[in-house]
Amino acid sequence: IQNDTGLPEESICSFRFLWRSTSVDDAVQIHWANGNIQVIRPVRGISINGEAQGGIRPPYWVILAFCRSADGRIICSEGYAHALYQLTCPVPVDSKLERNTLTALLNVASWLKRKPGTPELSLERPLFDTEVYVNGEKKYVLPDFIVTARAPDGKTARVVIETMGYEDSDYCARKSRQHTGMKQIGELHTDPPKWLDNDHPPFKKHMYGVFMHLRY
């Protein structure tokens, strides 16, 4: 990776390397198909989304940036890691709570698949803001998940899922404003349901009922 590029020494070289890893700290391990293990330690370190301490929410998507150093070598300059749901289902997640939400949604999809006449679900994990209009004013929102339900007759409906993490007043006010915009995308549901009420049903049972009685 470092120097065997086949490029002239004087040429400018930079590239990115993306893969999945079960362990991230100040260095990362790459397990090659031939069984070799290579440890890469970026010069400027690795930043991990939402983590002050490295490696507490594996597995991860990892992006490493490589460039040519002043002495002509190809080096790893810096890295970024973002937690994902599972290695076999590499959906980016921002927290363990989002992992729990996604587990519940996958369970619901599995239940529905076994029951005739129920909708087929597809999941979208937005990575960029969506433009919406609230009372004629342009806003930008970023839902955690969007589920599209397709009924047997082909009709579709979109459901927006938001994982709720805190209960302090500032967080609640900010989320409330965002939820107004998210409702322009689809029917909004939170995990947990009735988020500020301790007496709420399990999220997966709630969502099963939602998809069983969804209006298209």
From Swiss-Prot:
Keyword annotations of the record: Antibiotic, Antimicrobial, Bacteriocin, Plasmid
Biological process terms in GO annotation: defense response to bacterium; killing of cells of another organism
Family from the record: Belongs to the channel forming colicin family.
Protein name: Uncharacterized protein in cib 5'region
Gene source species: Escherichia coli
Phylogenetic lineage: Bacteria, Pseudomonadati, Pseudomonadota, Gammaproteobacteria, Enterobacterales
